[in-house]
Amino acid sequence: MDLSTAFPTLVTDLPAAFSMSVVGGVGLAMIVLDAFRNDHPAIPWLGVAALGVSAVWEITHLGAPPSTVFFETLRTGGFVAFINLIILLTGLATILLSVPYLNQLRYDYGEVYALIMFCTVGMIMLGSANNMVSIFLGLETMSVCLYVLTGFIREDEGAVESALKYFLLGAFSTGFFLYGIALMYGATGTMALPAMAAAELGTLSTRLLFWGGFALFLVGFFFKVSAAPFHMWTPDVYQGAPTPLTGYMSTATKAAAFAALILVLVHAVPGGEWQLSVAAVAVLTMVIGNVMALAQTNVKRLLAYSSIAHAGYLLVGLSAGTSAGYAGALFYLLVYAVMNIGAFGVMSMLEWDGKEGREQTLSSLAGIANDRPVLGSTMGVFMLSLIGFPPLGGFIGKYLVFAPAVDAGLTWLVVIGVLMSALSAYYYLRVVYVFWMQSADEVAATDPVRAAAFPRATVAATGTLVVCAVALVVLGVFFGGVLETTLGFFETTAMATAP
């Protein structure tokens, strides 16, 4: 690298990192502001403004052509802008939902919002990586922030225990991930994704080295997206973490990790040798997620197993290995982010002080829709969309990941996916039934912990849930424009070799 041209190149490429620069810079400003007053009311709104401005920037770049920046370590273009948009909007919704929640717990510290911003920066880097080093840096930046966010409520033993489990298992999975990268580098002699695909794997030993490394690499990714059999951490961590941040963890993390995985599959291993392996993991993930969710009485654990199942549905789209499958997965990531952040947002508003209030069993929430009809109505929309009920976005999302798999000859995989999706109707509709049709008096004898009044939600937080519910209807009816956009990425962006 010529040092005389390196600095001008970095300056030229800086606009491509607009979102990372703005979000990261505001995160630093939050820490400085927090040093003077740790509960400054302007801190979360600084985050909302930064994420909102960055989201608008990404919308204007959805039609941008593919390119690479920062010495070909990061990608730009419509594909990256779409993923960044999901991540930024999810982060924005998380802050709006966290404000009343953290105020109630008296944990509205500036560093919490700063960590959300830094975590978002890591996710953006992960979703735009064109190099294995960039993938690792983005993944670890995201992960370290999530470890802290999971357990920052120090008085809550469940949260601290969840954070410790997440950290230990996350560090363990990172070892597999790094070793996989090392083996792939040893086989190809490069860290750049397109160069890996172009490398000669002429001998049997070289091929074994590469595919062995790729298998270990996938283990690390499957851990991050809660795919079976690397999902065991998910229910405990989701249950113990602060509820709005659980929603962030379950949505934005998946968006960034699946985006990086798509880029690796498209650029580094464009052949179809991996399809059956990914399909097998998809089957295991769908079956375990849905079957285990049937027995759950804690709503957050139920949503955790639901999150595992939806990772399986996304893997069905990737298993097709086609442009339509990848485009369907992108659409599904958008829909999944909306309905899951909404579901966890509702649960955060139905949580009251004390251990009993944080348990959130189904029985403790019986008839809550009668007291909070807006929350009950939006939760109903989110549950129906998670089932895949038309005309909501979840139905279109599942169709768009299942149809390419059928076209790719994986009909057996789609049959399993449809059966598991039908099975999920039981536990999702059970939530709707408890919210709307079961009286609190019916369970008073067995669950006397029911609070007389739930925390008052802010207008911004309630508005966020309503917007999410309306967005699911819009995405289910007027999905053509979004689908056309995502298909275009794989004709001009992700499938193209960037210069």
Curated annotation (Swiss-Prot):
Question: What InterPro entries does its record include?
Answer: NADH-Q_OxRdtase_suN/2, ND/Mrp_TM
| GO MF, any single term | NADH:ubiquinone reductase (non-electrogenic) activity
Keyword tRNA processing recorded: no
Q: Where are the transmembrane segments?
A: 16-36, 42-62, 77-97, 109-129, 133-153, 167-187, 208-228, 252-272, 274-294, 302-322, 327-347, 376-396, 411-433, 463-483
Spell out the reaction equation it catalyses. Answer: a quinone + NADH + 5 H(+)(in) = a quinol + NAD(+) + 4 H(+)(out)
GO biological-process terms attached to the record: ATP synthesis coupled electron transport
Q: Which domain of life is it from?
A: Bacteria
> What membrane topology does this protein have?
Multi-pass membrane protein
What EC number(s) is this enzyme filed under?
A: 7.1.1.-
Q: What class of enzyme is it?
A: translocase
Q: Does the keyword NAD apply?
A: yes
Q: Where would you find this protein in the cell?
A: Cell inner membrane
Q: Which GO terms describe its cellular component?
A: plasma membrane
Keywords of the record? Cell inner membrane, Cell membrane, Membrane, NAD, Quinone, Translocase, Transmembrane, Transmembrane helix, Transport
Q: How does it assemble?
A: NDH-1 is composed of 14 different subunits. Subunits NuoA, H, J, K, L, M, N constitute the membrane sector of the complex.
Function (record text): NDH-1 shuttles electrons from NADH, via FMN and iron-sulfur (Fe-S) centers, to quinones in the respiratory chain. The immediate electron acceptor for the enzyme in this species is believed to be a menaquinone. Couples the redox reaction to proton translocation (for every two electrons transferred, four hydrogen ions are translocated across the cytoplasmic membrane), and thus conserves the redox energy in a proton gradient.
UniProt record similarity statement: Belongs to the complex I subunit 2 family.
- Protein's name according to its UniProt entry: NADH-quinone oxidoreductase subunit N
Q: Name the source organism.
A: Salinibacter ruber (strain DSM 13855 / M31)
The taxonomic lineage of its organism, from the top, reads:
Bacteria, Pseudomonadati, Rhodothermota, Rhodothermia, Rhodothermales
